[in-house]
Amino acid sequence: MTTQALQDHILFQTGYLVNGIWKTLDTTFDVLNPATGEVIAKVAKAGKAQTEDAIAAATQAFPAWRAKTAKERSAILYRWYELIIENKSWLGRLMTTEQGKPLKEAEGEVEYAASFIQWFAEEAKRANGEIIPPIKPGSRILATREPIGVVAAITPWNFPMAMLTRKLGPALAAGCTGVIKPANNTPLSAFALLTLAKQAGVPDGVLNTVAGNTHEISDAIMASRDVRKISFTGSTSVGKTLVRNAAETMKKVSMELGGNAPYIVFEDADIDAAVKGAIANKFRNAGQVCVSVNRFYIQETVYDKFVNKLADAVKALKVGNGLEEGVVVGPLIEPSAVNKVREHVDDAVARGATVLAGGKPHLLGGNFWMPTVLGDCHEGMKLAEEETFGPVAACFRFTSEDEVIQRANNTPYGLAAYFYTQNLSRVFRVSQAIESGMIGINECAVSTELGPFGGVKESGLGREGSVLGLEEYLEVKTLHIGGL
């Protein structure tokens, strides 16, 4: 499918959405294909005025949407889920074209995105309240759950569809309306999903979206007293700014922020399984994943075996345009991402790391970087302290369980962690000691619509997905009834 064929599709939108109408602006910004540098769209560059219009539309639509029964909202959500699945092939190609990840991964993300809509279509019917034992005769105490109101969802470029639905699924299920600010690198994926939402029966004004002038959009959202909740996925530094600004109007916040995930391979681990898990986790989306491993800790007795197997497997990974057959590692999102990877690799090598695979820009040039394995890494290197967000596996040695737990926890972040062992006692001991919101044990994937997703320490606030995800969009109201 050519870029022109994508552009001719009914789901290809380039404006901003307010009250069910896609509008254009004279001022636009370019959306680029990270694999080729081609301009694939010129998108309306929205700012303060457009954001205020979007907030007003969401505010006006809120009473009617919250008044719908849970069963009615559930039916609309389920139809949205069906439409996403029906359009999986086209949506996957759109995502690969604007984001870069291999087509198989992109189609997998479409299914993953749809799973949140399906899940919360069911959870919409379970926003239950409570009957509390009264304190005196002739009285009752009831606790009800009600939608919080207008929600602002600020989504990232690395999972432009799944992070959108992980927020909008529970928001709509709860009875909230919203304003969506997708990342400027990947707005087209969000626009396509919102077009399908309208087709599914989401009323005009319930979902609105603006992209463009990030500072103006953010400032308008944070200043509005009508916006009662912020849900953000992105960097810790930006998240902290949003939390500070949210305090001015006491908005509720959900923050899914940065990580520095450890991946511990104990000497009793199944080494082949650990290598397979490392490849699947570290090089998915070219390492541009918030729960991607940043530090591989391998016990001294199995270090050489693990890193040699890992390096051999990494050398066999095919790099290229995600639309090409067999490609498993696509480009990084933009030149600044390449520069950060280069900075981390060069710093590590200068401080004594050994390049076991890759370690330099790919011959394809542009935003491509060779999948890399670095051995003999140690604390003090930039890649040990900062999230690389690229296809670099940094390998560290350790000797004892107590030592590696201390080193794994020696970070302000606590989003995800992983370890491999066949010792059941160690499974419980280490999982309790690791300071992280999610832990994969002999498992490289920790995100599903069924399980709570979120971090501790400076990696976030709140949880997404699961039965807890709906709670983030509800307020509890207590009713004290007398004279019965």
Residue ranges and their predicted role:
Residues 1-34:
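Hydrophobic face of amphipathic alpha-helices that form TPR/SEL1-like repeat modules
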Residues 34, 48-51, 70, 88, ...:
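Residues at or immediately preceding the N-termini of alpha-helices
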Residues 37, 73, 95, 117, ...:
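Residue-level signal for inorganic ion chemistry
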Residues 38-127:
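Glycine-rich loop-to-alpha-helix module at the N-terminal edge of alpha/beta enzyme cores
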Residues 38-42, 227, 264, 318-319, ...:
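Conserved C-terminal structural/oligomerization subdomain of aldehyde/semialdehyde dehydrogenase
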Residues 40-46, 61-67, 153, 263-266, ...:
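Short, well-ordered beta-strand elements within core beta-sheets of diverse protein domains
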Residues 129-273, 398:
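Rossmann-like NAD(P) dinucleotide-binding subdomain of oxidoreductase/dehydrogenase enzymes
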Residues 237-378, 441, 483:
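ALDH superfamily catalytic-core signature
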